[in-house]
């Protein structure tokens, strides 16, 4: 799946009930990650130009609205994750005003509900991640004590987390562990 440190910019998956595959809507800088880390065909990755970023009143969703209109989807019901981080009221207004003939609905955490169902492969990776996390916590209890420099303790913890297990390599975390 798409995995990038780009959640703070406008991006979305566009899923049409009759489309063979979803579309991935991302900024130009993040398109490479979408091409590499998803199974989507290049034409299913919709890239918006950097000129849509911080160029008020232009907004990336202006381009998204154009795409929806080009595909003749502008008179359909459109579900939005209204309680999604970084999906602002301004984003909502851009879509609602740009698609006045559509019915805009809150799909109420639909993505999270779909993500609840895990494949056997996902469960295997989650168990491996839990093992690595447990190793990291054990190392934290060993490394942290009065008089030990914070950087030295963190170095040992990070080493453990990134080293992983003999079967599964670790990785850096998406945010700094606190």
Predicted features and spans:
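Active-site cores enriched in adjacent His and Asp/Glu residues with nearby glycine-rich loops
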Residues: 1, 86-87, 133-178
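A composition/biophysics-driven feature that prefers long, compositionally simple stretches
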Residues: 1-135
């Amino acid at each position: 799946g798409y995995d990038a440190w780009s959640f703070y910019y406008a991006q979305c998956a566009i899923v049409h009930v009759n489309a063979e595959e979803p579309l991935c809507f991302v900024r130009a800088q993040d398109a490479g990650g979408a091409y590499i880390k998803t199974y989507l065909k290049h034409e299913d990755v919709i890239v918006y130009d950097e000129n849509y970023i911080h160029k008020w009143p232009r907004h990336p969703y202006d381009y998204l609205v154009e795409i929806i209109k080009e595909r003749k989807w502008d008179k359909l019901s459109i579900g939005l994750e209204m309680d999604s981080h970084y999906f602002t009221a301004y984003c909502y207004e851009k879509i609602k005003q740009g698609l006045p003939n559509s019915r805009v609905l809150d799909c109420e955490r639909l993505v999270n509900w779909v993500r609840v169902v895990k494949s056997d492969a996902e469960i295997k990776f989650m168990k491996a991640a839990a093992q690595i996390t447990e190793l990291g916590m054990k190392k934290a209890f060993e490394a942290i004590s009065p008089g030990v420099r914070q950087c030295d303790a963190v170095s040992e913890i990070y080493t453990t987390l990134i080293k992983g297990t003999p079967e599964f390599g670790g990785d850096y975390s998406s945010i700094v562990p606190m």
